[in-house]
């Protein structure tokens, strides 16, 4: 049984997107900032809709995360 097998299909997508965001930023872990980006990338869940309704979008959050947290120091693959 995998770590995310008990998650809904949508939640599994969010985690995949979160991992992709973490790797894109050279991190070897998934932080809360990556989960937020994953939620926004998935785009169809209640959380994503609430964020969008408040004017919060993926591109802006991605830029803010990179400005606040920066990129990781190592290449992750």
Where would I find each of the regions flagged by the language model?
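Histone-fold recognition with a strong bias for associated Lys/Arg-rich disordered tails
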Residues: 1-77
């Amino acid at each position: 049984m995998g770590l995310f097998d008990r998650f809904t299909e949508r939640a599994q997508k969010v985690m995949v997107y979160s991992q992709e965001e973490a790797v894109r930023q050279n991190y070897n872990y998934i932080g809360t900032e990556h989960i937020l980006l994953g939620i926004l990338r998935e785009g169809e869940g209640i959380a994503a809709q609430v964020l969008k309704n408040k004017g919060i979008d993926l591109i802006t959050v991605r830029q803010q995360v990179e400005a606040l947290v920066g990129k990781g120091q190592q290449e992750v693959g």
